[in-house]
Amino acid sequence: MMKQRISIFLLFTILLSANGYAQKAIMRLTQQTLMHEVRETPSPLDGQHITVNPPRFMWPDKFPHLGAVLDGVEEEDYKPEVTYRIRIARDPEFKSEVITAERKWAFFNPFKLFEKGKWYWQYAYVDKDGKEEWSPVSHFYIDEHIRTFNPPSQQEVLAKLPKTHPRILLDAKDWDNIIERNKNNPEAQAYIRKADKCLNHPLKHLEEEIDTTQVVKLTNIVQYRSALIRESRKIVDREEANIEAMVRAYLLTKNEVYYKEGIKRLSEILSWKNSKYFAGDFNRSTILSMSTSAYDAWYNLLTPDEKKLLLRTIRENGKKFYHEYVNHLENRIADNHVWQMTFRILNMAAFATYGELPMASTWVDYCYNEWVSRLPGLNTDGGWHNGDSYFQVNLRTLIEVPAFYSRISGFDFFADPWYNNNAFYVIYQQPPFSKSAGQGNSHESKLKPNGTRVGYADALARECNNPWAAAYVRTILQKEPDIMEKTFLGKSGDLTWYRCITKKALPKEGPTLAELPMAKVFNETGIGTMNTSLGDTDKNAMLSFRSSSYGSTSHALANQNAFNTFYGGKAIFYSSGHRTGFTDDHCMYSYRNTRAHNSILVNGMTQKIGTEGYGWIPRWYEAVSYTHLTLPTTERV
């Protein structure tokens, strides 16, 4: 008991000692922001020493585009088509051995390793008359011991893409083997049971299902549209689960009854697009996702009219998403819904219809190159700046997209170091049976790791052969063996299908969580946790903190220099408020606001909401008996 008290005391003294230490080596930043909502500087920067070979090249849009504020509140702003050119060489005059490219978006992947030394690069905007507007010449360095990560080019990937269907949810050549492997798999049988229930429950029209009793009372147009979309999504998401179950039931059995009922049900859903209750990019992406799954899985059974219907739906919705993304997504600090789901959905639609829908080739080009350029994480430390709850909305994308690329190309996309770093984020931000560390919107709802988080850790363990992720999974499954079943068919995070088709096994039992360091800081993301007993949640005292260069943009909160404390997996000194929306008074003044968190109000002033209200973690130290960190003074309004 005495050791526990000492440990808890040490955790609390970290914050008390931080200011005194900071006086010895003061750091001052004067920039208004460390991050741009929309890119304002090129990458690589002039004089930069590159961290990965080959480098990824990105530059500001000629016509910067912020996009809609909220889902369903779209704006018809001007975003013209553009053309860019780029050149890269060893000499600043670009006279010999020049790498050149022309792109319709503001990024370029060379897909070739660069020799060590100094390189020069430059980009240009090309107007409609062909006139080039070149940027200043920048230089960068490729150092001797640089890390390499060089995925295959788009052309190499497409050369290996199967021309048969199905090819998205599974590869046709492995189909019979997958059926055989899953005959006695309880998770596979869950799809069949779900599909069988749908056979006996006819579908009603959207207007008969949606509950608008509360929506009609709202007078604010933003709140009205937001509430209407939430209610319609409940119905659309429910039906998405039904269609996806019937698609997978067919793939697991080849029983055509699931196709016949499924296409009938899907045809009704597709008629909802003209309803006044149907709006928002999540609903549109759901339509695109269902149509893609049905087209690819039932391709050999579809009638000509059914194929036309699905291809038309894919074309109409895919075109809208592509137009929204191009010259927007690549230069945004983050785009919530796109990273969470809609990018994955457009990517799968593109590869499913490549060679059969002319514009799919452009979608493939954009999506694949965008993933290589910026994803999976928006930095390298494995953290998630949007917080733990919204991290979990990205889980299917983080696994299914690279798993698909790896399957068709033979290249291991999970070899990106971000994934092994992210395994530590999963563990430290929410240890087994513990409440979330408390960052980002809806953090308060994450009382303990749920099935999607455990399923994601399971996939990381398999794909990366990561012993720590495997230990996390085994620790939780010992007490909750059915935890992954509880999130079956979850829209954004369920990885049941991944487990049904993968041949990769969970690593053999190895080290335990007790062998991990007690503290972990993700300094690029600006978060960290300290623990006393990671291997035993009941006895673990934990402190979490945040001071982030991302500020409070997106789903992040205005909680720079804030901390939370926990014991036995339960919150002791914790943030207040509840996620009630994105724009309501409680959210803005008593949830996202600094006063809802364990930080300091300087002269009663709260932190700015946006990238301007930033912090950072200048340094931290960890030893056997203590951990020490230094936090900055926070930007205020």
Features from the language model and the residues they span:
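Pro/Thr/Ser/Gly-rich low-complexity, intrinsically disordered linker/stalk tracts
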Residues: 24-69
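Recognizes extended acidic, P/S/T-rich segments that occur
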Residues: 78-114
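Extracellular fibronectin type III
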Residues: 130-142
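Low-complexity, Pro/Ser/Thr- and charge-rich linker/hinge segments at domain boundaries
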Residues: 141-169
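Aromatic-lined, polymer-binding surfaces characteristic
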Residues: 182, 191, 224-430, 435
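Catalytic and substrate-binding regions of extracellular carbohydrate-active enzymes
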Residues: 486-629
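Single conserved hydrophobic/aromatic residue that forms the stacking wall/gate
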Residues: 628-637
